[in-house]
Structures are given as structure tokens and as C-alpha cells.
Amino acid sequence: MKKTIVLLLCLTSINSWAVKLSDYKPFKFEPLFTNPVCATYAYATPVITTNGSTVSSKPKNVYCKPSDEEASVARNTSPQYRIIEWVSDKDTKELYLAYLSFSSKNVTAALCNAVKKGVKLSIVLDGGEDTLNHPVLNPSAEGLKKCGENLVKVTYRGSTTGLGYAHNKILMVNPGAKVSKILFSSGNMTSGTSINHENWNFITTSGDSYFSQAHKCVIESMIEAGDTKANFAKSLNACRSLIKAEQETDIQVFFSPVDGDKALQKVTEAGNKAKLIEAMSHRFSGALAALYMKLLDDKKPIKFILDDDIYWSVKRRENIGRNTSIEAFKIYKDLINKGMNTKFLQTNQNVFQLQHNKFMIFTFDQGGAVFNGAGNFTTAAFTKNFENFYYITIPEVVAAYNTQYDLYFDKMATSEEEMPRDYVLP
């Protein structure tokens, strides 16, 4: 009898015992950051800064133009390079994509080639303000149907009963297969793969993992039941209830709007526990901004990086880029003026190049964590939008984010004192 039990244990897949994603086989987690390679853009004449010094150009590899894309994506460490590598792999048989926007020519070409080879493709995109009746059709996605009409399905979601934007950022390779690949990011499938400042997270894991099955659930629920918030919640929860694997402890996933409250609770818990918080976001308001106000009142050290659109929206008292002056004034009043250690990435507002990262790093007395994902740190991201958020404690991933944050804060970002006095774009 004992021999029989031992034999059964040996035959049982190691994955049935996994409680961490890193326990599953295979496991690979590769965080990549766009870190664009850009020309030096000089001012016509040197510009005076707030502290009275002068600068001759915008910060190199921070301020970029579309002409810089080719060099940026040619590197094998570029997120776009890795996306195309995944799409083009001979073992890729089916792809799920969910994004707010989709326009990358290089990725579109790779997807077309894949479809021509027989790869099935399902895409979910935001459909604009009247998605159900008159969706705004995406030219790049619709064009892919010409590569294989019966293999490409495009679904438009968002801005219907109880819902905001379809703002997920997910690519899934071979959903439901023995081995699956999941990509989640701050960036859209646009210049977010190249010259925006973004994070892209590439994971290879077992199809048996909760993580893999949950991502399959969310995209299929968006396609099949994403017409209203209630229908989506019912479908997603029903699908997840059938997953036999436990949710992993080293990477927890939250899908808004269903899991928004749980995600906020996790961030609040981590913020209160942390001895240092380092964060960056494109938009920042609502419950998370209120949490940071409290943490500042509690004398919690916080470092924060914003797009310089926020800085200029306050200085010029007008909306700049994709940020609003109302939001910017509130960030200054409630956070920056109360001691939040803030710097800015000087991006190119003329071409809507963005600091589009949204992540927080929590340093605890022992270990640390990263909170990241698709959504901005706003009320809508946790209550209305389709979003995917993650709380990660895998040491190697936390270390990678710490290293990148140091690069941003110490080398690439500009303090308020060093910002140009006048609004000049070379």
C-alpha cells in the first residue's frame, strides 16, 4: 500500500503542489522597460532653469520623437522586439489581445504574418463612447481580417452600462495550452511599445496555474459578456470559480471593475506597512491620492515621478498633453506642496510622447513588493474601467523595478528646481 501511495505521488505533476507562480514549471518572468534610444534635441538657444542655471537641450533618451522609434525597437531588450518574437514563434497557435488602443505597424505586420500561417487571433479593444451601437472601428485591427478572415475576431467594449474604458493591456499566447505566455503592461500596442516610457512584463508559465487560467477568463468574459458591468462580473466570477488551482501568493492579479476594492485594499495595506514608497504614474487622483496624503501626514517617505505635463499644466494654468490643469493643481496642493519628493520626465507633448508608467514599489523591513498594471491611479480605474492590476513579491522582479526606478529618478527625471523656466519644445 505504501509503495502505491509513493508511486502516485511521483506521478502527480509538480504543478499540482504550486502555491507560488515561481513554483510552476516552466516559469520565466522578464520585466522590460522601453527606455527609448533617442537623439539629443537641442534648444535654438540655451534655456534658463528655475534655479537660474542654463541647459542646452532636453534630457537625452527622455524627450523623443517618432523618428527615434526604429533605433529603439531594434534592440533585443525592447518590449516591441519581444512581442514580435512571441507572435512569430513557431509554437504560437492562438493569441488573445486586449488593449485600449492598437496601432503599432510592426506588431500589426507580425500579427498578419502569424494569421497567414494559421494562428487564431482574438482582439478586444475600446470602442469609444457608443460601443454597443456605433463602435469606433480600429483600422489596424480591422485590417488584420484581410490576413485570414475566419481566423481573426475583433470585439469592441467599454463605455456602456456601468463601464468606463476598455483599458486592459494583455497579450496571451496559447490560452488553455499546457504552456502559456502572458504579457501585461502599462503601455498600449502603440508608441507604448517604443518611445513612451512604459513597463512590459513577459511571463511564461504552466497553463494549469491560476494566473494563466484567470487571464483566459477575463478576456473571454470581456468578449462574451462585456456589454454591461453586471454581466461581466457574473461571467468572470463564474469562470474563476471553476479554476481548481489556488491563486498564487507571489503574484496576485486583480481585474477591475470587479476586483477594484480588493486592489485598493492591497495597496493601502502595503503603503501602511512600507518604510519607503517609490512610485510613478501618468494620472493620479481619487482614493490612491487620498491614501498618499495620509501617508505623507504619517511622515512616510515617498518618491514620485510624473510626466512634465503635470508641471507645465500648473505653471501655464492650462491643460498640457494628456493631463489636465485641475488634476495637476490638486496633485501640487495635496501632495507635492506637502513634501512628496517629486521629479518629472520631460517628454514631448507635441507628439503625445508620455511618461505612461504606473507602478509603486514598497520597501518593507524585510523584502518588498511592486504594484503595477494597466490602469492609471484614478477612481475610474478601480470602479468603472476594464483594467488588470498586479501585486508582486517575487524578489527578482522587485529588484528589477528598483534598479529601473533608480535609473528614472537619479538619471532621467528632472527636479522642479532644474526644470526650464519657459515652456520651449525643440
PLM features: residue spans?
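Sec/Tat signal peptide C-region and signal peptidase I cleavage site
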Residues: 14-18
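Sec-dependent N-terminal signal peptides
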Residues: 4-13
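Cysteine/selenocysteine-centered motifs that mediate thiol-based redox chemistry or coordinate metal-sulfur cofactors
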Residues: 215-237, 402-426
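HKD-type phospholipase D/PLD-like phosphodiesterase module
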Residues: 19-93, 101-270, 307-395
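Beta-propeller domains
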Residues: 247-300
